[in-house]
Amino acid sequence: MNKPVLPPPGGPDDGDRILDEPLTEALSRRYLAYALSTIGSRALPDVRDGLKPVHRRVLYAMSNMRLNPDAAARKCAKVVGEVMGNFHPHGDASIYDALVRLAQEFSQRIPLVEGQGNFGNIDGDSAAAMRYTECKMTEAAMLLLDGIDEDAVDFRPTYDGQDEEPVVLPSGFPNLLANGSSGIAVGMATSIPPHNAAELIDACQLLLANPDATTADLLEKVPGPDFPTGGVIVESRASLLETYETGRGGVRMRAKWEKEDTGRGTYQIVVTEIPYQVKKSDLVEQLADLIDSKKAALLGDVRDESAEDIRLVLEPKSKNVEPEVLMESLFKLSALESRFPVNINVLDARGTPGVMGIKQALMAFLAHRREVLTRRARHRLAKIEARLHILDGLLIAYLNLDEVIRIVRYEDKPKEKLIETFGLTDIQADAILNTRLRQLAKLEEMEIRREHAELVEERDGILAMLASEAKQWKLVGVGLSEVRAALLKIKHPLDKPRPTGVTGRSVFGEAPQVDADAAIEAMIVREPITIILSERGWIRAAKGKIDDPSELKFKEGDKLGFLVPAETTDKLLIFSSDGRFFTLGCDKLPSARGHGEPVRMMIELDDKVKIIDVFPFKAGRKRILASKGGYGFLMPEEEALANRKAGKQVLNVGNEGAAFCLEAVGDQLAVIGDNGKILIFPLEELPEMPRGKGVKLQAYREGGLRDGLSFNAETGAYWIDTAGRRRDWAEWKEWVGRRAGAGKLVPKGFATNKRFRPK
């Protein structure tokens, strides 16, 4: 056995570094510190400049490296090394990924980095290694950094204390909403879509003119997101209003497409723009899989003919299919329609995380711009005061030029002599001594007084501005107008007119009311089939009718569970013991040549959940649902249709599970419990509900509900014994009682399994 490894003996001070505390408290404190670090230093953007620390550090490092738009690009590896060595104590991969994202036109609405080389593409291909690519800042990045060297923002020590970095950038435009952001922290996440910067600035101007403007007013200026990849936003205005009011919601977007005639009555669909953050290669693969799996019944072929622009060609299976119907079916099945989640979770000026609506975010940005304005003004004021002080000294020197020149030439300590003779300060004396004699002799009183007067006028203007909040807000608006004009010069091939009058990428539209399902069903040949579902959950569909079920073959240890006659155009409903309904298209079921396929591969059904009933959907029919706890209700069959693989929760079963799902065929309902007691009551006493728990059907001291039977009072009740023989029940009225009663014991000769029909 290996000997345990012990720590080396420590010195006399080691006891000071050993903490004796409960493990839970130590873990809790450290995890909290980690969570706060992740939230504040990595995952969430600042509401003022819209940047996470890594993006801010990349831009600041590039600014220090003088990688301005008019400069030559430098290797990205050089930038990453600068960021990692001086500001960001993390891996180079995360820094390079952040830099690459800032340069991608399909990721950023306004790219902040100009990349040269392979920076990835909309297909999802990665960027080239950092040693091969080069970068520099864009004009938009310069707008974010404008004033960084004029004390516009606070600085803090870097991680090693060797340098300083900005806490936030001056941010000339509302970058948070302009470029959006996404990130996952501990216990919270953020997801912000990009917007049109010109529209955002117009909204800011509206808030400057009317701080009481509502979110609805702001939506007149910012009607919705503006995604870099274009596309069509089909989210309703009411939904967008709620999203921007609360800061939470989502935006539904679709691919932009057009119809191209190919002659002889045929056509093809060409997709020119796809939803934001959808990888084109994955989309093509998804559409191809839909064709192979026969889920896209109207689509015949898909081709990617993209070059610099996106061009996905979709060929319909039949020329008789309407283009709108084809696209609606694909929107339902593929990423041609996507939903971008919105969660404007950001750090405020104090570093506190919180969810903001669009008005709160813009107001925080405007407050930041005002602070930047006043800080730059005070910085300029200090510069002016210093220059005026020097000009006063130079004016004294000019008025006494001969004496000043004599002192400078012949005195051993000219500085002390100047101060003593003319009453100058150290700064004024140094300024005179630092001026060459030739320049000192060329000083002109008019020039000094002119510069002095200009600076005094500028100083008075700054002081007046600092004393007036109204003037400050006015200058903020003027600055935003200048930034707006600069941003509008940035053009892109996808730019189109927007509702606000400016150009943008995304447009707005409405999803047409097209019944794609009906069109798909119309193309399915209507044929009779028999659905076979085994006890272990293997499903298949046989053509025609099965006369002798005993001839069916199953896997070893398996046997018949359900035998359901249907048609290929039917929707198959599956009811599970956890109260959920699942829907499968009968035309998509595997053939009966083999044993079929596990139904759990087609629907999300847990292994512990049992299938209670299987039947084809029929419009206008009603079902009786009941749980083993003895509760139930009446439900229209339309409420059972589910569009998701996870199904639709309809019956709240609690811990007991579902008991039965009966077709409502008469006016009476008979229920039997595990205790062998039967209760019959009118079906009209059951409420009709789309979902829920229902009302009490029968009372039990022990056990629960076992089975039920719906029948017509005129034809009478019955049961089917274990041999499959029908037994009419003439005395059924003796078991009639009030709903929720206990009932009476079963009649003589009743089925031994205490069920109205064999399970």
From Swiss-Prot:
Record's subcellular location: Cell membrane
Domain of life: Bacteria
Any one cellular-component term (Gene Ontology): cytoplasm
Active site residues per record: 132
InterPro entries tied to this protein: GyrA/parC_rep, Gyrase/topoIV_suA_C, Topo_IIA-like_dom_sf, Topo_IIA_A/C_ab, Topo_IIA_A_a_sf, Topo_IIA_dom_A, TopoIV_A_Gneg, Type_II_DNA_Topoisomerases
Keywords tagged on the record: Cell membrane, DNA-binding, Isomerase, Membrane, Topoisomerase
EC number: 5.6.2.2
Gene Ontology molecular function: any one: DNA binding
Positions of the Topo IIA-type catalytic domain: 44-516
GO BP annotations listed: chromosome segregation; DNA topological change
Site (Transition state stabilizer): 131
Membrane topology reported for the UniProt record: Peripheral membrane protein
Reaction catalysed by this enzyme: ATP-dependent breakage, passage and rejoining of double-stranded DNA
PROSITE patterns: TOPO_IIA (PS52040)
Pfam families, per the entry: DNA_gyraseA_C, DNA_topoisoIV
Site (Interaction with DNA): 52, 88, 90
Principal subcellular localisation of the protein: membrane
Family: Belongs to the type II topoisomerase GyrA/ParC subunit family. ParC type 1 subfamily.
General function of this protein: Topoisomerase IV is essential for chromosome segregation. It relaxes supercoiled DNA. Performs the decatenation events required during the replication of a circular DNA molecule.
Cross-referenced PANTHER family: DNA GYRASE/TOPOISOMERASE SUBUNIT A (PTHR43493), DNA TOPOISOMERASE 4 SUBUNIT A (PTHR43493:SF1)
Subunit structure and binding partners: Heterotetramer composed of ParC and ParE.
Designated name of the protein: DNA topoisomerase 4 subunit A
Organism whose genome encodes this protein: Caulobacter vibrioides (strain ATCC 19089 / CIP 103742 / CB 15)
Taxonomic lineage of the native organism: Bacteria, Pseudomonadati, Pseudomonadota, Alphaproteobacteria, Caulobacterales
